A protein has these predicted regions:
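Loop/turn residues immediately N-terminal
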Residues: 37-40, 47, 77-81, 112-116, ...
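C-terminal closing repeat unit and adjoining cap/tail of repeat-based domains
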Residues: 222-265, 272-273
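Short loop/turn segments that connect beta-strands within beta-propeller blades
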Residues: 3, 44-48, 83-87, 119-122, ...
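Conserved beta-propeller blade signature
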Residues: 31-33, 71-73, 107-108, 116, ...
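Aromatic-anchored, glycine/proline-accented short structural segments
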Residues: 146-201
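Generic beta-strand structural signal
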Residues: 26, 43, 67, 75, ...
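Intrinsically disordered, low-complexity segments enriched in Gly and acidic/Ser/Thr residues
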Residues: 186-240
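Short coil-to-beta transitions that initiate beta-strands within beta-rich domains
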Residues: 5-28, 50-69, 89-106, 112, ...
């Protein structure tokens, strides 16, 4: 069993057959990875791996990792943790957190109690849907879009109104592909905006969609069967295989390489398609 602070080789970083990974992020030559129940790890340019979360509670569950201006943010079941210069900053609110993003000088996080917001180093405030779990969000010029436990909500800044779209399924991930709003349902569905003011909930047989990741113009779907790329076939949104053979939970890219967090195969690396 791996102990906190133990350095590990990059070739066999840990018992990769038993460690599931939920999130991966690249920061130059640094690679961060989170394993539910096992902590957060960092690989440096020398190829060594370090357990960096030994200061954090043992029962901590990391939902997502994010990077911004050299800081690592861990969205966890006990709040938003920040890692910088080898030290962790405790969350100001012990509220389960699922996503963190910035917009200018302001920050947003999705929580068990809606969407929260702060500017600069000010206090966090609830801004939308405090009665629902919000899993993900998109902040675009005209709209603020939430994926929550019952579906999707859209705030129109021009009309100052919210529109709620109950879908009968929680939406845990959001992105945009060629004008379509896309989401991942908590039951493994792909949620597709139909450009007609509604959404279609699409199932792909025995494939379960975990999350959607945008890279440039491409959108990738992490699934229980592997990694897929979103595209069109006969005018319909579909998924094209990129890398199959193991469940992929998250991806990130750097310098022409793609890094995949997997459930049973550790952190996998391949050339960017």
């Amino acid at each position: 069993m791996m102990e906190g602070g133990e350095t590990l080789s990059k070739q066999t970083p840990w018992d990769w057959m038993t460690y599931p990974f939920s999130s991966v992020k690249t920061d130059g030559d640094l690679l961060y990875a989170a394993s539910p129940g096992n902590g957060i790890y960092c690989s440096d340019e020398s190829g060594g791996w370090q357990h960096i979360s030994e200061q954090l509670p043992a029962e901590l569950v990391v939902n997502r990792l994010q990077l911004n201006q050299g800081k690592l943010y861990a969205c966890t079941n006990e709040g938003l943790y920040t890692f910088e210069d080898g030290q962790w900053e405790q969350p100001t609110h012990a509220v389960p957190c699922y996503q963190y993003k910035t917009s200018g000088q302001c920050s947003f996080m999705s929580t068990d109690y809606g969407l929260w917001h702060r500017c600069g180093d000010g206090a966090w405030h609830k801004v939308a849907y405090p009665e629902r779990k919000v899993y993900d969000f998109l902040n675009v010029p005209q709209f603020l879009i939430l994926g929550h436990e019952e579906g999707i909500a859209v705030y129109d800044r021009f009309t100052d109104e919210w529109a709620d779209f109950p879908l009968g399924v929680g939406v845990t991930s959001l992105t945009v592909y060629q004008g379509h709003l896309l989401g991942a349902g908590e039951g493994g569905e792909l949620i597709v905006g139909n450009k007609g003011g509604g959404f279609d909930v699409v199932s792909f047989g025995n494939r379960l969609v975990f999350t959607l990741i945008r890279h440039g113009r491409d959108v990738y779907a992490c699934t229980d069967k592997g990694l897929y790329r979103i595209g069109y076939l006969c005018g319909q949104i579909t998924m094209f295989a990129v890398k199959l053979g193991f469940p992929v939970t998250d991806v990130d890219t750097h310098d022409g390489q793609m890094y995949m967090a997997t459930l049973f195969e550790g952190i996998q690396q391949m050339d960017l398609p």
